Each structure stands twice: as structure tokens, then as C-alpha cells.
Amino acid sequence: MKTQLIILLFSLTLNQQNSILIDFGKEKKGRYWNVVNDGVMGGLSKGGKKITKNSLLFMGEVSLDNNGGFSSLRKSFSEVDISNFSDVEIRYRSSGISFAFSLAVSRRWYVPNYKISLESTSSEWKTTIFKLTDLRKHYIGKALNDRLKKETLKDIIRIGFITDQKKYGEFEFELDYIKFK
């Protein structure tokens, strides 16, 4: 019996190290996420979130007025070491404007972050998997040539999503889960 317990505990530890799951349905992780719109710089875009039975729904409207043009959904700041992982899997659906998955290494808005675009799904659920090293460095919305380096994955302090085009329009973006593996 003691041996079985040790094996069970060891396998649970291995599973925890093999992936990190952010579940917006069953575990309701959406309460730790916040909406940030371009109002922080004078824009007039609107965005909101709603925790549903099985997901986190992010919806709103991007406005280009007053030099605006984005709405974002971001996890609260917290250190996340994802250096043991090479891939991220996201189950989502969207309509309207396209989105990007983003990782930040600084609290300062002017320090570059890393993004990768997500395909629009026409409101159909989609599961997408990509390499973390495929994320590209961006500086205030402009893509740079650098890709995310493996050693930078230990320095992540924020995970998020942002409208990926400076384009007017309504949007819905619904998340089931994010899994680092």
C-alpha cells in the first residue's frame, strides 16, 4: 500500500510538471483576468469580460477615435516560469476582429512583449498548438525580427490576448483553456 501511494504521488508530481493548465470553464480562472482598453492612452475602445459556465467571454468594440485601436484581456501580474515547456495549446472561438496571444516580461508598457496571431474561427471552437519560440517580439504594436528565446520563458510575468489589428469593429473572443506543455 505504501509503495502504491508513493507511485501515485510521483505520477501526480510528474503530471504537474509536464503541463500547466489554465482552465476557464471548470476552474473559473477568468476571475484573475482583467480587460485593458486603449483608454489608458486616450482611445475610446470598449471591452468587457463575462465568466460563463464553461468559458471566459471577452467582448467589445475597437474604436480608432482619439488614436485608439486595441482592447486586451490580461492575467494579473504574476511570475510564471514556463521554461520547462515548448508548446502552448489554446482552445478558443472568435468572431469579428483577429486576436493575438501575448506574453510580457515587464510591467512597463513600453518594454517589448511577445505575440503570435490567432486565426479567426467564425464562432466555431478551435484548438491550436504552437511553439513558444514562434512568438515574435513587438514594440508598441510593431513586429520586430526577434523571436522569443527559450531562456526568456523563465521571466514571463503576464499572459494575455489583444486585438491584433488596428481596425474598427465589434468582437467576441471566448476561451476554454490555455495549456503550456
PLM regions and their residue ranges:
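Bacterial Sec-dependent N-terminal signal peptides
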Residues: 1-19
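Beta-rich carbohydrate-recognition modules and glycan-binding surfaces
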Residues: 16-181
